[in-house]
Amino acid sequence: MAQKTFKVTADSGIHARPATVLVQTASKYDADVNLEYNGKTVNLKSIMGVMSLGIAKGAEITISASGADENDALNALEETMKSEGLGE
């Protein structure tokens, strides 16, 4: 399993549009991809799961991936977080 922690830098946190971008990126991979925030873990391929967390600016989130293409998935999600201005 591979994982990485990010600090959310987007002023609006992770709301509908950025959540959709993350879900679309995660869904391109076969690996199981999860997002953990505030003690709760959700499937990052589920828009409802991600939205239910209410992730605000300044939050620390951990994205983990497990499976054959886990490193590719995690690298793509890291790039998405940075390119979309969501986190670092």
Swiss-Prot record:
Q: Where is the active site?
A: H15
PTM entry text:
Phosphorylated during sporulation.
Residues bearing PTM Tele-phosphohistidine: H15
Q: Look up the record and report any one GO term of the cellular component aspect.
A: cytoplasm
Q: What is the effect of changing S46A?
A: No phosphorylation by HPrK/P; abolishes the catabolite repressive effects of glucose on gluconate kinase, glucitol dehydrogenase, and the mannitol-specific catabolic enzymes
Q: What is its main location?
A: cytoplasm
Activity control note? Phosphorylation on Ser-46 inhibits the phosphoryl transfer from enzyme I to HPr.
What is the annotated localization of this protein? Cytoplasm
Q: What is this protein called?
A: Phosphocarrier protein HPr
Q: Which organism is it from?
A: Bacillus subtilis (strain 168)
